[in-house]
């Protein structure tokens, strides 16, 4: 059920962003061909869910200084057994920020990214097939979780001060498509 729902979202995204054909095709192939794609236990890689959280005024985004990776990125994480990808992104947003009043601006995908996670003490190197959603927080009062070194509301026009990653900068550009849309 959740794989079928994810595939619908992926196909809609592919139609909206035809210049991302290669990433979309790789992601769709993975979800279609591996029934365990939503399970963290799949060692070669698995679907993850993350979120681009805008403040109430929509001029800042909440980023985490990720404890394991040591970089500033959007909040997100793994799906818990049988969870829908949008529900997982919303759960991760609330857990990692401590902000209870976060809601989707759109249920459509904001962005897709497939990236390598380096080997660590618990896991071999593997791929994250990250599905990203656009959310808005009802307040700016966050609490730092154990997964973060820090959290920050970053002005959208100063995003490059925190990250030069294409996948981060790309979400800033795409948010307007979903907001207007």
Question: Language-model features: where?
Answer:
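Histidine-centered active-site/metal-ligand motif
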Residues: 46, 66, 78, 126-128
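NUDIX/MutT-family hydrolases
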Residues: 132, 142-173
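Acidic, metal-coordinating catalytic segment for phosphate/diphosphate chemistry
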Residues: 14-50
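Active-site segment of metal-dependent pyrophosphate-handling enzymes
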Residues: 98-141
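Short, well-ordered beta-strand micro-motif
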Residues: 53, 134-136, 155
């Amino acid at each position: 059920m959740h794989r079928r729902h994810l595939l619908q979202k992926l196909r809609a995204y592919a139609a909206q962003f035809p210049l991302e054909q290669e990433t979309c095709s790789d992601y769709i192939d993975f979800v279609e061909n591996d029934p365990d794609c939503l399970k963290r236990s799949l060692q070669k890689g698995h679907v993850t869910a993350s979120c681009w959280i805008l403040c109430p005024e929509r001029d800042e985004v909440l980023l985490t200084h990720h404890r394991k990776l040591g970089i500033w990125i959007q909040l997100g994480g793994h799906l818990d057994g049988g969870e829908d990808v949008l529900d997982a992104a919303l759960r991760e947003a609330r857990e990692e920020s401590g902000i209870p009043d976060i809601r989707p601006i759109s249920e459509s995908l904001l962005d897709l990214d497939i990236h390598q996670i380096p080997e660590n003490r618990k896991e071999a190197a593997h791929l994250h097939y990250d599905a990203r959603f656009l959310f808005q927080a009802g307040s700016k009062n966050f609490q730092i979780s154990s997964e973060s070194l820090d959290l920050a509301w970053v002005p959208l026009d100063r995003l490059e001060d925190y990250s030069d990653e294409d996948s981060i900068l790309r979400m800033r550009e795409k948010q307007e498509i979903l907001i207007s849309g």
